């Protein structure tokens, strides 16, 4: 239990210049001495994380050795391309457009997802929009269930609780999107002798908010140790365009607008960051609640959520299991 530091948003403060310098040095060293690659490839979503990582790579390697990829699909937000181009242009890096819609259609991504939705909403049509959401975790039953929200072409929304089979089917089909993007990233990395850079922040990385062998795959992850609050502070220091810094964090996975809060984290990122920090540093839940405006009971719920996500997503962090060790240390 932490009995010395007063818990407040100030505990997540950083010296942005020093943090940036350390990350840039690490990128350069990793690329040259460990990965032995000429440059880096990364997907640009128009979000804060990929924008910050791109800027750090440019500062470390030079714009000429950074390739940004735009990889929209049929259900991507209209903001995605605009903001992704904005960051690429502001950094002066080469960029390429790879529309992954044909690949997803060929793999049955949309069809498989729609079939899963019809297990709970048989009238669902291809023209409808959808997303999956959690209930308000702070006031929900002990074990919250996901629901699917469907919007018809005339704007009418319907909501239905998902069975385990339907939920897993929707998620499995949607994961084609992240895995397809990563496949494209590695294609360009292979042809250029570049490394693939991942863009998770600590909240996402530690809580398993990524797809195994999808956006979770990368050769280096420069900001995985930084809470999202700290990434925003770094973005300001790096002069990331204001339009990107002011954008609400989104999954940009489903055809209906969806925040990360309603899909996965239960709280806005600044409060979730502080709760995760408090849990990691041994603060009692009542102090986390006081620092984030939650009741003691609500803070306890968030602590349980943090622990359950750690346990449930441990598999995502695991390397392939070998029966016997293959590479042994030299004697």
Regions found by a protein language model. Give the residues of each.
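ATP/NTP-dependent adenylation/nucleotidyl-transfer catalytic domains that generate, transfer
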Residues: 2-42, 52, 56-59, 64-67, ...
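Conserved G/P- and acidic residue-centered "switch" motifs that form tight phosphate/ATP-binding loops
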Residues: 47
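Acidic, Mg2+-coordinating phosphoryl-transfer loop and its flanking beta/alpha structural elements
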Residues: 72
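Conserved donor sugar-nucleotide recognition element shared by glycan-biosynthetic enzymes
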Residues: 80
């Amino acid at each position: 239990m932490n009995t010395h530091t007063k818990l407040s948003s100030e505990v997540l403060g950083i010296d942005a210049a020093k943090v940036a310098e350390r990350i840039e040095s690490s990128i350069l060293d990793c690329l040259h001495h460990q990965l032995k690659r000429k440059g880096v490839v990364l997907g640009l979503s128009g979000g804060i994380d990929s924008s910050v990582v791109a800027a750090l790579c440019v500062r470390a390697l030079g714009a000429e050795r950074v390739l940004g990829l735009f990889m929209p699909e049929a259900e991507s937000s209209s903001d995605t391309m605009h903001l992704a181009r904005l960051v690429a242009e502001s950094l002066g890096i080469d960029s390429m457009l790879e529309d992954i819609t044909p690949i997803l259609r060929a793999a049955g991504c949309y069809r498989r997802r729609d079939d899963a939705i019809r297990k709970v909403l048989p009238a669902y049509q291809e023209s409808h929009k959808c997303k999956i959401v959690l209930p308000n975790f702070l006031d929900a039953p002990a074990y919250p269930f996901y629901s699917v929200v469907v919007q018809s072409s005339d704007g009418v929304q319907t909501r239905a609780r998902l069975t385990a089979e339907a939920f897993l089917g929707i998620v499995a089909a949607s994961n084609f999107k992240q895995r397809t993007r990563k496949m494209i990233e590695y294609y360009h990395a292979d042809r250029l002798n570049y490394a693939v850079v991942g863009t998770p922040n600590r909240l996402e990385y530690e809580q398993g908010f990524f797809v195994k062998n999808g956006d979770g795959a990368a050769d280096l992850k420069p900001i995985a140790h930084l809470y999202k609050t700290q990434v925003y502070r770094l973005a300001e220091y790096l002069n990331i365009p204001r339009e990107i810094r002011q954008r609400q964090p989104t999954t940009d996975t489903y055809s209906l607008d969806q925040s990360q809060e309603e899909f996965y984290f239960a709280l806005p990122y600044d409060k979730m960051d502080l709760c995760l920090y408090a849990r990691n540093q041994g603060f009692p839940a009542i102090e986390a609640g006081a620092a984030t405006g939650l009741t003691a009971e609500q803070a306890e719920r968030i602590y349980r959520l943090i622990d359950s996500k750690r346990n449930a997503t441990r598999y995502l962090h695991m390397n392939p299991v070998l029966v016997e060790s293959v590479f042994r240390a030299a004697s």
